[in-house]
């Protein structure tokens, strides 16, 4: 499609479920396994650019416990990589939203850096 051609020129790639990513920094380390653990540093933004969540200190997460958009993208990353993700609401918080911060049906933008991979 014309839109996906424009995306490719801008270095934006599409993953399953409509999750878009662009690589900000390449990684050469291990890739997470399904259900494994990941250590990440991230900033989460709403479509208007306002930050709704970020961690200054790297955090470990189990891939089973994160939003679907992360579950789609993180296993494709190598440790050391930093990606910008655009996640459709269906792969984020969907119709429910999240508290006062994220309205229902809101797509989310994350800059996520994969620091380390665990079992």
Question: How should each PLM-predicted stretch be described?
Answer:
Residues 9-13:
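N-terminal beta-hairpin/loop module of FHA
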Residues 52-68:
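Well-structured core secondary-structure elements of compact alpha/beta domains
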């Amino acid at each position: 499609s014309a839109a996906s051609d424009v995306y490719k020129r801008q270095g934006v790639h599409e993953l399953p479920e409509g999750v878009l990513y662009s690589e900000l920094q390449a990684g050469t380390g291990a890739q997470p396994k399904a259900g494994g653990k990941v250590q990440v540093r991230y900033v989460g933004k709403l479509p208007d650019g306002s930050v709704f969540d970020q961690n200054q200190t790297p955090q470990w997460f189990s891939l089973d416990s994160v939003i679907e958009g992360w579950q789609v993208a993180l296993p494709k990353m190598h440790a050391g990589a930093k990606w910008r993700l655009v996640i459709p609401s269906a792969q984020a918080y969907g119709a429910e939203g999240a508290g006062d911060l994220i309205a229902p049906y809101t797509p989310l933008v994350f800059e996520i850096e994969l620091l380390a991979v665990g079992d």
